[in-house]
Swiss-Prot record:
Its main location: plastid. This is DNA-directed RNA polymerase subunit beta. Pfam families: RNA_pol_Rpb2_2 (PF04561), RNA_pol_Rpb2_3 (PF04565), RNA_pol_Rpb2_6 (PF00562), RNA_pol_Rpb2_7 (PF04560). It is an enzyme of class 2 (transferase).
Length: 1072
């Protein structure tokens, strides 16, 4: 982006820039900062000293390529080498060696890391900035209670509160509080120093009685009193060093370490001049905070808004990786100390190489990327998803909030989010408002503040230069910021005399001369997902939120298509996602193929490999298609190959299809969608999906498992696709139940376990019974497809710990079908309810049948009118062969600008194509269309158009499930839950009431016994189903009732149940 003093317009920053900058900051500064903190380590006799030389650390280039790391399930990392020295103090000798400390996972060109073959991304966290915050709350009597909350760098809190008698307390937990005098004395101040350093000493003296004086008579007394209140379990503690250490560890270290940012905030808020390197809370801070609190009580000073972004900080990738590096060095320090002591004890001569091991660093990073809540598996459904995932901001995670405890106020939009955090793009459900998305131009500045760019209005200086400023949330409050964006920076354009502006979180209307800054871009306050919605200003924010989330779920289609109506950001999104192949040098194409492009430039030939049918972790297909012919001269930065869901270097997530808005026989009731068979037969919404199935071979106690094609337990039909090694052949078509990898596991069978006739037959005929069981990899239900890749990965080392892995990749071609979910870009989503023959679909006046029929009742109540504008403009663009790229909020140029644009384009289309039905003045945008079944026109004119419709990842093939019988839970003996476990459907309390209401007693009994947890009855059902006959009625209670009885018995409640016979109603007592 342009810096200060540059002319012209700003450019859109790289969407992955935040991730790259964070990682570079960690490598350049974070590593050095943590290595400098590594202490000199001495042995107990202080004869040997070990130290690291920070000036010379090296990161080695990775030995493997990114693609190989993914396929072989390895980590794409760099080895870290640091020089270390061992000094013998007696002889003053020093031994210096370069040591391998461990592996640090590197960031690749997508802004992600590859750990154990999986793409992972670290998302940024928003935390409360350390410092002090004053707020007031009403107590149960309606009286204002003022509190000052000190937040430490670790997230620990210490609250100062003032009561009705003007006494000041320090609250260390919800139940415990101590006098501020005791706390100050425990921190090392005496009474005289306290009274000298406060503005209101008489208030402090007013609550000082004899008991208090005794408590603060000496530092030891104060510490004892503090310990008794805060950490003591019972008894009378005695002052000692261990007591001080425990208090230091439990309280002061967690709640009193402010860090550099906290010290800066503290000094600024309390008008102190304590040096920046003094990062701990001092008695002086506590007393100044108490003074401010007393001032608040008497109406002086201002309260703080905890939710303002100036009181938040961003914990970026750099901070998280640096914290983990520091943790690894602490572990390394403990290892080195232990090794030195062991070597001295056993009279061995240590060397730096022997003292240091790479395990602490490598395992710390592996566990961080694998287990930390902010390290997530990269969502790669489509190119947009990849970029958006790295730009998320989360309030959740260590030191943050939880979905259960976060209040509405925290989740809400705040005026300081303007241009920094998108007001639309957030997750739905329990985390709404807690996971946000960065605005397009926002960046992370010094100290973790979010900065947004503005243009400085420099008409007063009469210069033609345009200065761009990046302002943090604390600075932009003091400027008048014009809300109008600057697209054309021509100084001669006469601005309006009165403009809307923002000042100190208020929106005003002021004269143009008073404006200091102006926004730089119409999309400045939106995230990437929201910026891809055309006519977003005509939509309700809830629907825009759904749309920005659903675009991330769009499946890349086999034949992608550019949108007719877009916003202009599609090219940038596709470029930054890294799915397209781009020329790094200019030159001439000398060879092109499906797997590589060879480029000749500056006398060198450069081979550019293309991605071929690569699986993403959402099982979508990533594939690159060459876009340049042989012999063509190209320039640097030109697109050589399109990736998944891109066309000509632009993002293309869906298709432009002909849509009509009308109810059709109830088939589009409640957001259902009716589609034409053309979408199926012409592969318009066909997508490819790649599934990965893997199996490992282990060495068991009976011997190693074998991969073989000779499986005596299975019929030959299931093994038809196996080669001589027992692995499925490339290119073969496999159905559910087929064996992909044949595997036998050895097992020992005792002689006594065979039936006597078995033993006799084996003795007579000499038959060898198989001593192994089959543990083959079989294709699960719904997995049919073509085998496109097989990989046999053999890891180095012993096979016990590193088993061989065989991965089979199967490609599925999925057409659109009933039950699939489709959506537009305005939150208009629906499930396909019926696929009609094209002759039955409603058709236009030129005879074209429509492709989809949406329900018009889904528009007015949801207030997403943008879809109607897009629909009509798409029709005009299709007829005129034009593509439109429209920035949002065009009503600022003139009233009804969007409607005028759409109508003028429709009018032009009707003139050029000589089709008057395209624009009919009586009902503009609508047209009379005909019922395909009868040929009669519908009663009213209908809106028709060409919107951009996406097919989403929620597909019926992944969700449909049925079960006759299957696995049962061990304790309750009821069917398991969920599709993955072949589970059954639960008939719960309310379902039982519904069946009772209809009086279907036999169905209800089946549901609660045979089909559920009556063990004997369900076995008899299977038997009678095979043999024939009537199913006997169950005579005893089901297993869940027995379980209830047992659980009550564990509570010492004896419960017996009785069965009353139908004939004579005598009570037959049965033992439960």
């Amino acid at each position: 982006m342009l810096g200060d003093g540059n002319e012209g317009m700003s450019t859109i920053p790289g969407f992955n820039q935040i991730q790259f900058e964070g990682f570079c900051r960690f490598i350049d500064q974070g590593l050095t900062e943590e290595l400098i903190k590594f202490p000199k380590i001495e042995d107990t006799d202080q004869e040997i000293e070990f130290q690291l030389f920070v000036e010379t650390y090296q990161l080695v280039e990775p030995l493997i390529k990114e693609r190989d790391a993914v396929y072989e399930s390895l980590t794409y990392s760099s080895e870290l080498y640091v020089s270390a020295g061992l000094i013998w103090k007696t002889s003053r000798d020093m031994q210096e060696q370069t040591l391998f400390i461990g592996n640090i996972p590197l960031m690749n060109s997508l802004g992600t890391s590859i750990v154990n073959g999986i793409y992972r991304i670290v998302i940024n966290q928003i935390l409360q900035s350390p410092g002090i915050y004053y707020r007031s709350e009403l107590d149960h009597n309606g009286i204002s209670v003022y509190t000052g909350t000190i937040i430490s760098d670790w997230g620990g809190r210490l609250e100062l509160e003032i009561d009705r008698k003007a006494r000041i307390w320090a609250r260390v937990s919800r139940k415990q509080k101590i006098s501020i005098l005791v706390l100050s004395s425990a921190m090392g101040s005496n009474l005289r120093e306290i009274l000298e350093n406060v503005c209101y000493p008489e208030i402090f003296l007013s609550f000082l009685n004899d008991k208090e004086k005794k408590k603060i008579g000496s530092k030891e007394n104060a510490i004892l009193e503090f310990y008794q209140q805060f950490a003591c379990v019972g008894g009378d503690p005695v002052f000692s060093e261990s007591l001080c250490k425990e208090l230091q560890k439990k309280f002061f270290q967690q709640r009193c370490e402010l860090g550099r940012i906290g010290r800066r905030n503290m000094n600024r808020r309390l008008n102190l001049d304590i040096p920046q390197n003094n990062t701990f809370l001092l008695p002086r801070d506590i007393l100044a905070a108490a003074d401010h609190l007393i001032g608040m009580k008497f109406g002086m000073g201002t309260l703080d808004d905890m939710n303002h972004l100036k009181n938040k900080r961003i914990r970026s990738v750099a901070d998280l990786l640096q914290d983990q590096f520091g943790l690894a060095l602490v572990r390394l320090e403990n290892v080195v100390k232990g090794t030195i002591c062991g070597a001295i004890r056993h009279k061995l001569i240590p060397t730096p190489q022997n003292l240091v091991t790479s395990t602490p660093l490598t395992t710390t990073y592996e566990s961080f990327f694998g287990l930390h809540p902010l390290s997530q598996v990269l969502d790669r459904t489509n190119p947009l998803t990849q970029i958006v995932h790295g730009r998320k901001l989360s309030y959740l995670g260590p030191g943050g909030l939880t979905g259960r405890t976060a209040s509405f106020r925290i989740r809400d939009i705040h005026p300081s989010h303007y241009g920094r955090i998108c007001p639309i793009d957030t997750s739905e459900g329990i985390n709404v408002g807690l996971i946000g998305s960065l605005a397009i131009h926002a960046r992370i500045g010094q100290g973790g503040s979010l900065e947004s760019p503005f243009y400085e209005i420099s008409e007063r200086s009469k210069s033609k230069k345009v200065r761009m400023l990046y302002l943090s949330p604390s600075r932009d409050e003091y400027y008048m910021i014009a809300a109008g964006n600057s697209l054309a920076l021509n100084q001669r354009i006469q601005e309006e005399q009165v403009v809307p502006a923002r000042y100190r979180q208020e929106f005003l209307t002021i004269a143009w001369e008073q404006v200091n800054l102006r926004s730089i871009f119409p999309f400045q306050y939106f995230s990437i997902g929201a910026s891809l919605i055309p006519f977003i200003e005509h939509n309700d924010a809830n629907r825009a939120l759904m749309s920005s989330n659903m675009q991330r779920q769009a499946v890349p289609l086999s034949r992608s298509e550019k949108c007719i109506v877009g916003t202009g950001l599609e090219r940038q999104a596709a470029l930054d996602s890294g799915v397209t192949a781009i020329a790094e040098h200019e030159g001439k194409i000398i060879y092109t193929n499906t797997d590589k492009i060879i480029l000749l430039g500056n006398g060198d030939t450069l081979s550019i490999p293309l991605v071929m049918y690569q699986r993403s972790n959402k099982n979508t297909c990533m594939h690159q298609k060459p876009q340049v012919p042989r012999g063509k001269c190209i320039k640097k930065g030109q697109i050589l190959a399109d990736g998944a869901a891109t066309v000509g270097g632009e993002l293309a997530l869906g298709k432009n299809v002909l849509v009509a808005y009308l109810p059709w026989e109830g088939y589009n009731f409640e957001d259902a969608v009716l589609i034409s068979e053309r979408l199926v037969y012409e592969d318009i919404y066909t997508s490819f999906h790649i599934r990965k199935y893997e199996i490992q071979t282990h060495v068991t106690s009976q011997g190693p498992e074998r991969i073989t094609n000779e499986i005596p337990h299975l019929e030959a039909h299931l093994l038809r696709n196996l080669d001589k090694n027992g692995i499925v052949m490339l290119g073969s078509w496999v159905e559910a139940g087929d064996v992909l990898v044949g595997k036998l596991t050895p097992q020992t069978a005792k002689e006594s376990s065979y039936a006597p006739e078995d033993r006799l037959l084996r003795a007579i005929l000499g038959i060898q019974v198989s001593t192994s069981k089959e543990t083959c990899l079989k294709l699960p239900i719904g997995g049919r497809g073509r085998v496109i890749d097989v990989r046999w990965i053999q890891k180095k080392g012993g096979s016990n710990y590193n088993p061989e892995t065989i991965c089979v990749y199967i490609l599925q071609k999925r057409e659109i079908k009933v039950g699939d979910k489709v959506a537009g870009r305005h939150g208009n989503k629906g499930i396909i309810s019926k696929i009609l023959p094209r002759q039955d679909m409603p058709y236009l006046q030129d005879g074209r049948p429509v492709d989809m029929v949406f329900n018009p009742l889904g528009v007015p109540s949801r207030m997403n009118v943008g879809q109607i504008f897009e629909c009509s403009l798409g029709l005009a663009g299709d007829l005129l062969d034009r593509h439109y790229r429209i920035a949002p909020f065009d009503e600022r140029y003139e009233q009804e600008a969007s409607r005028k644009l759409v109508f003028s384009e429709l009018y032009e289309a009707s003139q050029q194509t000589a089709n008057p039905w395209v624009f009919e003045p009586e009902y503009p945008g609508k047209s009379r269309i005909f019922d395909g079944r009868t040929g009669d026109p519908f009663e009213q004119p209908v809106i028709i158009g060409k919107p951009y419709i996406l097919k989403l990842i929620h597909q019926v093939d992944d969700k449909i499930h049925g079960r006759s019988s299957g696995h049962y839970a061990l304790v309750t003996q009821q069917p398991l839950r969920g599709r993955a476990k072949q589970g059954g459907q639960r008939v719960g309390e309310m379902e039982v009431w519904a069946l009772e209401g209809f009086g279907v007693a036999h169905i209800l009994q089946e549901m609660l016994t045979y089909k559920s947890d009556h063990i004997r009855a369900r076995q008899e059902v299977l038997g009678t189903t095979i043999i024939g006959g009537t199913i006997p009625k169950p005579k005893d209670a089901p297993e869940s009732f027995r379980l209830l009885v047992r659980e009550l018995r564990s509570l010492s409640l004896e419960l017996n149940h009785f069965l009353v016979s139908e004939k004579n109603f005598q009570i037959n007592r049965k033992e439960a």
